[in-house]
């Protein structure tokens, strides 16, 4: 059975408590439970790990080598600072999807730069905690055959990807 690893960086253990006006009231445990259940529906094992420490995240990435098929990562503040986590991801050659709960492009200027986006197979930004579910859905779409994949430009210049041949089309928005 394929395995997806969800990695969460610093302060995401406070999800649901920290700045709910930005990040919402859903807890990290809620997110993990939803993703694990969604994985089961698609015959995918979903594991999750959170750390406030860069080295622990790097160690977990290294442990994933040859054991994990895809990583869903919310590097949190490390998005803008960690070449080391980027290098770890590239070093193990596991494809990854970058997720951010808030729209980092609508926040402070320093949050606009990511050390991960250019290497990610997809970036899901600003969909709240649903972004994790969208990442799992996107990853499991590879199980479907004969998908008609399309994209278009949104009103704000964002790129919207969608699979029109699915009974319930899934959107992935990249700003």
UniProtKB/Swiss-Prot annotation:
Q: What is its EC number?
A: 4.2.1.10
SUPFAM superfamilies reported for this sequence: Type II 3-dehydroquinate dehydratase
**Top-rank taxon, per record:** Eukaryota
Q: In which pathway does it act?
A: Aromatic compound metabolism; 3,4-dihydroxybenzoate biosynthesis; 3,4-dihydroxybenzoate from 3-dehydroquinate: step 1/2
Name any one GO molecular function: 3-dehydroquinate dehydratase activity
Q: What's one GO BP annotation on this UniProt entry?
A: quinate catabolic process
Q: Which UniProt keywords apply?
A: Lyase, Quinate metabolism
The protein's name is: Catabolic 3-dehydroquinase
Quaternary assembly: Homododecamer. Adopts a ring-like structure, composed of an arrangement of two hexameric rings stacked on top of one another.
What does the sequence similarity comment in the record state about its family? Belongs to the type-II 3-dehydroquinase family.
> What chemistry does it catalyse, as a reaction equation?
3-dehydroquinate = 3-dehydroshikimate + H2O
Check the record and name the InterPro entries matching this protein. Answer: DHquinase_II, DHquinase_II_CS, DHquinase_II_sf
Q: Reply yes or no: does the keyword Lyase apply.
A: yes
- Record site: Transition state stabilizer: 18
> Which gene holds the coding sequence for this protein?
qutE
Q: Provide the taxonomic classification.
A: Eukaryota, Fungi, Dikarya, Ascomycota, Pezizomycotina
Q: Where is the active site?
A: 23, 100
State the PROSITE patterns in the record: DEHYDROQUINASE_II
Biological role stated in the UniProt entry: Is involved in the catabolism of quinate. Allows the utilization of quinate as carbon source via the beta-ketoadipate pathway.
Instruction: Work out whether the entry's keyword set contains Lyase.
Output: yes
